[in-house]
């Protein structure tokens, strides 16, 4: 399921649970467990566990407002990145109980959907921060990403965008690495503390939504690091790693200037320290 779905009432009845309000003592039925902030994803696993089938309709059923600024986007994407790891044990239990032999592609897609945000973003950070010089120097390595980017560009084209928008999307995804990791960290925090994370609703306000300073500073720090890594690799004669770091740094620089803006990013960075100084005074 997603933000838009058509459900059968019998299906909801099958996954419903009965609970008691701790304050009033009244009993109630809960159809969506609301254990994570991506409750629709967990409900889809519950439906499959009960033997129901889910069908994807590859078209827009409705339109949702796009986050107007980086601060609102941070809230949305951090929420989307939170919950997949928490649902994974339930999915693995389902796969163990009911081996999906003929539905192995479905199992692969479900596992990938729940774990990809954590795996991809952690993998990118490791790739950026640790010197895999001999591996990156292999000229065949860039070809491994060609199929992925070709399919990505094809999907963008089918959705009505230009294929060249692929570079803008990739730049945005680079800038969102700290945000996605923040959502993954909240999943781990909930797993340890057993406290359900607060649902951060995407703001729909006229004024700009300020972004937490950490999510603005981190892309700047990563850009500076990639620039220095490109210079160091070039000095050492490592051409392919230098090109890769230079391209990623350039795309991050573009993302910061286009999707955040220099003035707004500066305002977000100094906003909290100033408020603390005033409060202390």
Give the location of each predicted region.
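Juxtamembrane inter-helical linkers in multi-pass membrane proteins
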Residues: 83, 191-205
